[in-house]
Amino acid sequence: VAGLKIAGVPDLVAGEPLPESASLADLNNQARELNGLWEKAEELPDVFLLHNHRTARALRPGLFPIVVCGHSHRSAVEQVEGTVYINAGTTGAAGIRGFQTNEPLPYSLALLYFQEIDGELVLQAVDSVFITGLGTSFSLQRTFIEHSRNRGVNVENIR
């Protein structure tokens, strides 16, 4: 997308007939395999997508500039040693589980803002958007990404 390289892997249990979560051992194995595979790659994606937040956090910091995950239904943006970990939260509102809770789960999403700097797309900010009450209200939280390169950047020009 506009020169942005995106790669990812499906949820380990996406093809399973029953909605069971993957075991911690399976998640750790997936992370180990991904670390080994991508550490040897000649070209890395700018954004790496995967379902489970546990696997995302087990990816070596600095391997990918941006890792986007979910599964926990808890929105978060965290910078660790050269990687921005983004949990989009609940873009699907937890499916049927969204109707089985006492408190409604808000829909949420993460909107990423990039700016081209010296021919490279650089993440400048992440908007975490939360929609509640069947679309009757929303809130937005903007997280600015710390780079030595983005000091003095006019945030009105980010896209």
Located regions from the model:
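His/acidic metal-ligating clusters that form di-metal
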Residues: 2-84, 150-158
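Conserved beta-sheet core of the metallophosphoesterase superfamily
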Residues: 47, 52-141, 147-151
